[in-house]
């Protein structure tokens, strides 16, 4: 048994007061439990030949949603007892609900939207593609948009990544990389059949398929599936605010990388891949790696002959300030996983880029069976690839990365005063990716109790004020579209600041507690789930 200290569990301007003007966004239980009445009212309006008013339409949609839709990462008991925001339209960097309320999209629709909603160039590219073909399989056929996109992606990716394997989500991009690394070593002339294991990191999140969940290091999300999963070599990821070894970043000499080196010495001969989120572990609460850590990991992979898989699903396409996060440390991975922002946030598409060396390991005669027997029905979908090509056009024509730099600097300036708030423990940021960790006591870094649901309440309070954000436990995540203006940045940060003050200093709940026909006024206090220590950063908001 190792005695390494890293074996311990990692614990996971205007209107900045509690009386700020808010949207009239109610949170009671009536609409979600009267499906028949709401649907009947809608039918009666239809029968009378008059359109239902916006309120009736919203009530009907909420009722249907509560009756039929199972939302991801959402406790449906809470959801069905609320009146959720139903998004009906969008415009630029704003979302619009069925009642006509506008909300600034502060998390780019779960980290996907790049250039704003309804960008005319991307809209038109999809319309043009619709006039040709919406989808055609890549099994045995080529497709114009997927061919053009592969050429564009390899041209902008780190040098040496020459081949593109398409899929449809971040999870499947990582899953493909896992199977490629494993199969390569089972069949390639230069492969090593002993290399059957994968190194992954604490607090990692790589998706929701069984392979990607096996890599995950978040017990709240992944623990229950333990019997289904393979066992990776688990290495410590940097967590400077809550270092499990109780070290300080200015004096530790990157001890966590030293622990990775120790594990590599012991397990390197059996590893086919190391999978890492470069620069930032997003779903862990925007945990930022110290400068040089990623470069050091690349060097260790080279030394031990292990493929480095860079999961840039969350950080790719400009969110860290460069097209790809790896660029910031001069790192070229052996495989690069892309999704989310690849289509500008329009349509599901993913890609796994690999080197020519890896691709060559799958070449052989028909009877050699070195084929990569893997793929998805909608792989390389024509509409999605057309959107991705148009998004890359916008990057070039609008000089997105160049014009983003002053707004990144402005974001840093706007965030600085939040360090003075008594319940802000840590602010972590790379590019526009920002995590604001809220704590009960900043001196001791004591987290809030899970049943207080501080991050959830701040999110709802911000929504009442017209801004959409989504927490990771008690870490408030800001990740706006790259098209956000300086004025909108000010609105985003000032609104979140006001919501934090309202909740942590004045007790606002954002309309969280609701009177339910089948339960107490505050169901969370009556029915608080057991949350594993160190997993609180996994809690998300309905």
From Swiss-Prot:
Catalytic reaction(s) noted: (8S)-8-amino-7-oxononanoate + S-adenosyl-L-methionine = S-adenosyl-4-methylsulfanyl-2-oxobutanoate + (7R,8S)-7,8-diammoniononanoate
Stretch list, region Disordered: 509-542
Gene Ontology terms for molecular function: adenosylmethionine-8-amino-7-oxononanoate transaminase activity; pyridoxal phosphate binding
Keywords for this protein: Aminotransferase, Biotin biosynthesis, Cytoplasm, Pyridoxal phosphate, S-adenosyl-L-methionine, Transferase
Signal peptide: none
Main localization category: cytoplasm
EC numbers, comma separated: 2.6.1.62
One Pfam family it belongs to: Aminotran_3
UniProt-annotated binding residues for pyridoxal 5'-phosphate: 170-171, 311
GO cellular component, one term: cytoplasm
Record-linked Gene3D superfamilies: Aspartate Aminotransferase, domain 1, Type I PLP-dependent aspartate aminotransferase-like (Major domain)
Pathway the protein contributes to: Cofactor biosynthesis; biotin biosynthesis; 7,8-diaminononanoate from 8-amino-7-oxononanoate (SAM route): step 1/1
Record field: compositional bias (Basic and acidic residues): 515-524
Record's subcellular location: Cytoplasm
Cofactor: pyridoxal 5'-phosphate
Role played: Catalyzes the transfer of the alpha-amino group from S-adenosyl-L-methionine (SAM) to 7-keto-8-aminopelargonic acid (KAPA) to form 7,8-diaminopelargonic acid (DAPA). It is the only aminotransferase known to utilize SAM as an amino donor.
Subunit field text: Homodimer.
Annotated PANTHER family: ADENOSYLMETHIONINE-8-AMINO-7-OXONONANOATE AMINOTRANSFERASE
Family per similarity comment: Belongs to the class-III pyridoxal-phosphate-dependent aminotransferase family. BioA subfamily.
Name of the protein this chain belongs to: Adenosylmethionine-8-amino-7-oxononanoate aminotransferase
Organism: Nitratidesulfovibrio vulgaris (strain ATCC 29579 / DSM 644 / CCUG 34227 / NCIMB 8303 / VKM B-1760 / Hildenborough)
């Amino acid at each position: 048994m190792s005695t390494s200290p890293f074996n311990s569990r990692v614990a996971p301007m205007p209107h900045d007061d509690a009386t700020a003007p808010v949207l009239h966004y109610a949170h009671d239980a009536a609409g979600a439990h009267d499906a028949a009445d709401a649907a009947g009212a809608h039918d009666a309006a239809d029968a009378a030949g008059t359109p239902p008013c916006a309120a009736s339409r919203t009530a009907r949609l909420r009722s249907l949603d509560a009756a039929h839709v199972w939302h991801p990462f959402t406790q449906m008991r809470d959801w069905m007892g609320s009146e959720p925001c139903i998004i009906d339209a969008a415009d630029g960097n704003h979302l619009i609900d069925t009642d006509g309320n506008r909300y600034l999209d502060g998390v780019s629709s779960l980290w996907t939207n790049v250039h704003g909603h309804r960008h005319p160039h991307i809209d038109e590219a999809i319309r043009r593609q619709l006039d040709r073909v919406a989808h055609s399989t890549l099994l045995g056929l080529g497709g114009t948009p997927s061919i053009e996109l592969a050429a564009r992606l390899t041209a902008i990716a780190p040098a040496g990544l020459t081949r593109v394997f398409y899929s449809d989500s971040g999870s499947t991009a990582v899953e493909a990389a896992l199977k490629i690394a494993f199969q390569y070593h089972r069949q390639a002339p230069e492969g090593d059949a002993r290399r059957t294991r994968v190194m992954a990191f604490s607090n990692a999140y790589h998706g929701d398929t069984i392979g990607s969940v096996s890599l995950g290091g978040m017990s709240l999300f992944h623990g229950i599936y333990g019997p289904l999963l393979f066992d990776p070599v688990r290495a410590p990821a940097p967590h400077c605010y809550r270092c499990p070894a109780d070290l300080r970043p200015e004096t530790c000499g990157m001890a966590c990388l030293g622990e990775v080196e120790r594990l590599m010495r012991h397990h390197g001969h059996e590893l086919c891949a190391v999978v890492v989120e470069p620069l930032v572990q997003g779903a862990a609460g925007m945990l930022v790696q110290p400068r040089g850590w990623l470069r050091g990991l690349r060097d260790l992979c080279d030394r031990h002959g292990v493929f480095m898989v860079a999961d840039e699903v969350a950080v790719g396409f400009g969110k860290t300030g460069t097209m790809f996060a790896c660029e910031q440390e001069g790192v070229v991975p052996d495989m690069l996983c892309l999704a989310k922002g690849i289509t500008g946030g329009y349509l599901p598409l993913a890609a796994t880029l690999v080197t020519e060396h890896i691709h060559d390991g799958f070449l052989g005669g028909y009877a050699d069976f070195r084929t990569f027997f893997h793929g998805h029905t909608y792989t390389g979908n024509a509409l999605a690839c057309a959107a991705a090509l148009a998004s890359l056009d916008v990057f070039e024509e609008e000089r997105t990365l160049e014009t983003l730099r002053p707004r990144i600097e402005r974001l840093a300036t706007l965030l600085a005063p939040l360090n003075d708030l008594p319940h802000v423990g840590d602010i972590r940021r790379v590019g526009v990716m920002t995590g604001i960790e809220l704590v009960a006591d900043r001196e001791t870094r004591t987290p809030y109790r899970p049943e207080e649901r501080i991050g959830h309440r701040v999110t709802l309070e911000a929504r009442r004020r017209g801004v959409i954000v989504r927490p990771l436990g008690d870490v408030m995540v800001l990740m706006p579209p790259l098209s956000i203006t300086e004025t909108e940045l000010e609105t985003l940060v000032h609104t979140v600041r006001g919501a934090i003050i309202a909740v942590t200093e004045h007790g606002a709940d954002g309309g969280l507690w609701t009177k339910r026909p089948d339960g107490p006024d505050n169901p969370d206090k009556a029915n608080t789930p057991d949350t594993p220590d160190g997993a609180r950063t996994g809690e998300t908001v309905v």
